[in-house]
Amino acid sequence: PLPFILSRTYSSYRTKTPAPVGSLGPGWKMPADIRLQLRDNTLILTDNGGRSLYFEHLFPGEDGYSRSESLWLVRGGVAKLDEGHRLAALWQALPEELRLSPHRYLATNSPQGPWWLLGWCERVPEADEVLPAPLPPYRVLTGLVDRFGRTQTFHREAAGEFSGEITGVTDGAGRHFRLVLTTQAQRAEEARQQAISGGTEPSAFPDTLPGYTEYGRDNGIRLSAVWLTHDPEYPENLPAAPLVRYGWTPRGELAAVYDRSNTQVRSFTYDDKYRGRMVAHRHTGRPEIRYRYDSDGRVTEQLNPAGLSYTYQYEKDRIT
């Protein structure tokens, strides 16, 4: 029933209309990073692969379809879709409140669902802010609904240094997960304290990061760990350690992944000059896979010392 699955994908592709860098760092995306930009006559959906999908402006109840990605984008505002519409039955699985809201957008890649709900983060207004505040010119993922009406909810902070960021998830089985976030300053201080306790010289770890990368604006907030904090089936048997933990470079790049036994299972290396451009990755116990890029930032070689290696050539209408 809509279990919470924290997957991640990496792409060195840089769109001209990027969404902000997510909590996994530049180049990385997870499903929760889906974001819709509302322009004057265009809607730009940034998917969890970092690509930009363009749709025409939609009136309430209208839908757009991306043939390349087999994805529908529908604007709320109607109780029912036309009976002949492929999504008519799936639309009725949504709560009436969502169907009737013209300010919400919904996306799906199958008539079987699920729906990705694109809304906005409720936040605490500033003391001198004129109310009601206008809605932001973008929409973020607030939850999922499957064809049986079961939901998965993303909880975003309403105030503070993590305002707008996902800090909790409730899945379709009622389990609650806590996402621990850190700022660049917090990671820098932790690195200094570890160096002091270990009796070593602290390495260069800046307190701030540049506000922009080739992959979009970057607020420096990163995901540190994911905890299971509530399970209705086993309320007294919660794990005493995080389900997953992440390590970061001083430049805010994802460096390592640790499982629930605190064993490192993945490692990543990046270009010294281009922040976020991965040049190598490795599964623990396996050979390191390396990448080479051309001057345009495109992968030209994939080098595997223990298996097949690949070279890529870019032509006008194909890659060989």
Regions picked out by a protein language model, each given a short descriptive name:
Residues P1-Y10:
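Predominantly extracellular/luminal regions of secreted and cell-surface proteins
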Residues P26, T42-T320:
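Extended charged/polar low-complexity repeat regions
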Residues A32:
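Short helix-loop capping/hinge segments that flank enzyme active sites or metal/cofactor-binding pockets
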Residues P3, T15-K29:
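Short, polar loop/linker segments at the starts of domains and inter-domain junctions
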